[in-house]
Amino acid sequence: MKIKGENMKKLLLLIFITSGFIFAQTERHVMHVFYHMNVTNPAGVISALDKFHASDCGKKFPGDLGLMSETLNGASDSTHFIIASYMTREDFQNAGALTQSCPEAATMLGSLMNSASPVSDLAIVPIIEANDWTVDGAFTKYDMRMNLENEEEYAEAWSELMESNVKSGSVTSSYGLNRVLYGNDEFTHFVYIGASDFVTLTDGATELTSSKAFEKFSRKVKGMREVLNTSLVIPVKAWPRR
């Protein structure tokens, strides 16, 4: 969802009503919230989140936080996004109550406003989540529009493609399909493929798109979805829940 003329403080308060990655994932998250920003001072964003995480309020925060760099992202104004993840929907609610009542959250929000401006926000639910994405060092993300009625059939075809390429060695780490629950004015779903680093990621992508399994996948999903953008996402830092 595009943020047009809204107050940065209002937006960032929502970050903590709604929240991982680069933390070790021992359980699955039930939802993730992405807050896309145009960052002018990356070090300032990291510092603001560092201080909040170290505070008494941050120590009680029931979610995982991470900062991702959208290294290559087409024409979008977004340069980074904060990903906030929860193990339960109750954690989502509790985080909102906590951060609206603690002064450390207000301090952090003020610091973030000095280092970034909002671009868009969205909440997602995982449909497919294979392997531990929190340990990966690079991702290719494909944003797309798809009718909900085609989701199950697409998910089956995507899983078949991924499983085939895991066997061939071109997919070596995490992959997934996510549905946008809120903020789907631009895209309704996205898929991602992760790898340990950029070289491994791009080598695998070349092999995948030239495989017979990809040809079969393309035939199966023709007309089901429209790919709108492909982006390179690099993890920057994570602040795991205590």
Locate each region found by the language model.
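Short, Lys/Arg-enriched N-terminal segments with co-localized hydrophobic residues
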Residues: 1-7
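Terminal low-complexity, poorly structured segments
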Residues: 7-10, 45
